[in-house]
Amino acid sequence: MATNKSVGVFSSASLAVEYVDSLLPENPLQEPFKNAWVYMLDNYTKFQIATWGSLIVHEAIYFLFSLPGFLFQFIPYMRKYKIQKDKPETFEGQWKCLKKILFNHFFIQLPLICGTYYFTEFFNIPYDWERMPRWYLTLARCLGCAVIEDTWHYFLHRLLHHKRIYKYIHKVHHEFQAPFGIEAEYAHPLETLILGTGFFIGIVLLCDHVILLWAWVTIRLLETIDVHSGYDIPLNPLNLVPFYTGARHHDFHHMNFIGNYASTFTWWDKLFGTDAQYHAYIEKSKKLGKKSD
């Protein structure tokens, strides 16, 4: 009975979303996107799309999303939004970071990306336009992937902070006490594999089209670069997402080294009390701010 009731609720919700979608004006970008997608299918093999397409999406999105944070350091007006104002970015640090990022991208992540084609073939993941899911279904599946990844990340990240193994793996990521956007994937190769597994679990469970893989890559990179940006920008639309961690939440993790282990949502830290030091720090900062006023 409960199962039937749940199915009825989800069916009603789906119908409601479809109805609202039918009322919206036609997306002017849909036809150009469809033409580009069909052109890609007609001119490239599935292996090329899955491998080189995924690599291009990852690299383009990663460096595009990192660009604003990189430029902020040269804009005096933006300095007031930097969270750790006493730790400015340095050329040496950013160059060191970029070299490791490129190594990880091409010697750790690229071999994994090369397996994308075989994954889609094994699970019969479609590429064609006719089976392209509606935007709200893709968004819902990306949300599911985010919840799964966040859960994996919280517990494995917390494990990597164990005193017996921290210095061997996760210490690399904490070389920068004040994070910056491009540093999001600066990590020991083993950490890239361990924490990166959480990204793929959702794909294995929820992927119904190759577009979901690229959409999820985009959303995950947007989130991780944002929380590593080192800047708390007002009117950041990501802060409208319920339970979203945000830059201040993760910045404190880099500054304090413990606590705030989640990647995207705050509920695991709240449930296990691993955000207690963060909230105490926020309260102390507010009191000091009032005294200075």
Curated annotation (Swiss-Prot):
Enzyme Commission numbers on file: 1.14.18.9
Biological or metabolic pathway of the protein: Steroid biosynthesis; zymosterol biosynthesis; zymosterol from lanosterol: step 3/6; Steroid biosynthesis; cholesterol biosynthesis
An annotated GO BP: cholesterol biosynthetic process
Extent of motif Histidine box-2: 170-174
GO cellular component terms given for this protein: endoplasmic reticulum membrane
Top enzyme class: oxidoreductase
Residue interval(s) of motif Histidine box-1: 157-161
Keyword Isomerase: no
Major subcellular location class: endoplasmic reticulum
DNA-binding as UniProt keyword: no
Cofactor: Fe cation
Comment, domains: The histidine box domains may contain the active site and/or be involved in metal ion binding.
Designated name of the protein: Methylsterol monooxygenase 1
Species of provenance: Mus musculus (Mouse)
Gene name of the encoded protein: Msmo1
